[in-house]
Amino acid sequence: MKEFFFMAGMQRSGATILSAILNQNPDVWASPASPLFRMMTTQIQSHNELENIDYNRSEAIDNVIKNIPHIFYADKKAKYIIDKNLNWPNPVGAELIFKYITRNIKFICPVRNVLDVITSFDTVINSTDSKNNIMDEQVLKNTFADKPLADRRADFLMRHDKDIALSLEFMKHSTLPQFRHLFHFVDYDDFISDPEREINKIYDFLEIPKFNHKYENIVDTSGISRESLTGIKDLHTIRPTIQKVSRRPEDVLLPETIKRYSGLEFWRELR
């Protein structure tokens, strides 16, 4: 029987390379962004269907939902599955896990300075292959043309209904004492400076046997596409070596944008 863990966290925070390293261990499979959460929430609606109200099969429906993770990962031989979706730490996700998957809830959360995340997005979008992309179309349509494009992108990315703000909101459940033990944060800068230490901390958190990982010539075996639905290429492409290649936010964003999105790294107060 497979054991399930969960990865949430922020975009552009090293989740892809972190997963690539963990996947060197044949007993571990860390997925790219996965549809498992949506699949399970969709099936929960079956409880409210008219057919189930007339002929109650709620217990059978629950059994089907419980089996979805095992069927979904039936092609993986790994003992330990780390399913990635930013929604897992929200109340619906946590309840799904507790009721249908495991009582041993553990969230791995790659995180990064918010301004560095914004700057990293800007860097990737400005690459030659990504000049024309869906996200910029939305940025131009939904932000005011009173500031440079980089700052308009920042405002768009930080909207309450976009992934950065959502992931921050969901992870803030870790600030509640009764939920703190469910979360393990992997800060991008800590990971870059000492990846072996951070990987070992993950094993300690998951309470599974350690593995002798390699930190050079890293290969992503997940099969995730280089293309993105946003039109931004190489969002998930990793380098073979672990290094920080990034511009400074001060070189990209206006001072008022930097001020607006500074100091949001609440997890640093939890250590």
Feature names for model-found ranges:
Residues 1-5, 147, 153-158, 172-177, ...:
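PAPS-dependent sulfotransferases, especially Golgi type II membrane carbohydrate sulfotransferases
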Residues 41-42, 191, 266-271:
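C-terminal/domain-terminus segments
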Residues 30-32, 82, 109:
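Hydrophobic residues in well-ordered beta-strands that form the structural core
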Residues 69-94:
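Glycine-rich phosphate-binding loop used to anchor ATP phosphates in small-molecule kinases
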